[in-house]
Curated annotation (Swiss-Prot):
<dbReference type="GO" id="GO:0050832">
    <property type="term" value="P:defense response to fungus"/>
</dbReference>
<dbReference type="GO" id="GO:0031640">
    <property type="term" value="P:killing of cells of another organism"/>
</dbReference>
<dbReference type="InterPro" id="IPR010851">
    <property type="entry name" value="DEFL"/>
</dbReference>
<protein>
    <recommendedName>
        <fullName>Defensin-like protein 153</fullName>
    </recommendedName>
</protein>
<keyword id="KW-1015">Disulfide bond</keyword>
<keyword id="KW-0295">Fungicide</keyword>
<dbReference type="GO" id="GO:0005576">
    <property type="term" value="C:extracellular region"/>
</dbReference>
<feature type="disulfide bond">
    <location>
        <begin position="30"/>
        <end position="81"/>
    </location>
</feature>
<comment type="similarity">
    <text>Belongs to the DEFL family.</text>
</comment>
<feature type="disulfide bond">
    <location>
        <begin position="50"/>
        <end position="77"/>
    </location>
</feature>
<dbReference type="Pfam" id="PF07333">
    <property type="entry name" value="SLR1-BP"/>
</dbReference>
<keyword id="KW-0732">Signal</keyword>
<keyword id="KW-0611">Plant defense</keyword>
<feature type="disulfide bond">
    <location>
        <begin position="41"/>
        <end position="60"/>
    </location>
</feature>
<feature type="signal peptide">
    <location>
        <begin position="1"/>
        <end position="26"/>
    </location>
</feature>
<keyword id="KW-0964">Secreted</keyword>
<keyword id="KW-0929">Antimicrobial</keyword>
């Protein structure tokens, strides 16, 4: 009886890992940088554009490219791939 319960627990554990893996798949966020004028970022406009264009959410961050000015903010959109 003890072996049967251990096997059933192992089967349930494997099944739950498979279901969790399939559920997470496809929900890995992608990142896209949107162009903005005057090196400024309006959070509400960024959020609205990302929701409309990518069905995701946006946030304002400093640029990550070498030629970006230090004080400039850019809109980055996070959306499901």
């Amino acid at each position: 009886m003890k072996n049967v319960s251990q096997v059933s627990v192992a089967v349930l554990l494997i099944f739950s890992i498979l279901v969790l893996g399939i559920g997470v798949q496809g929900k890995v966020p992608c990142l896209s940088r949107m162009f903005n004028k005057n090196n400024t970022c309006s959070f509400l406009r960024c959020e609205a554009n990302c929701a409309r264009k990518y069905k995701g959410y946006g946030d304002c961050r400093p640029g990550d490219r070498p030629h970006d000015k230090k004080d400039s903010l850019f809109c980055f959109c996070n959306y499901p791939c």
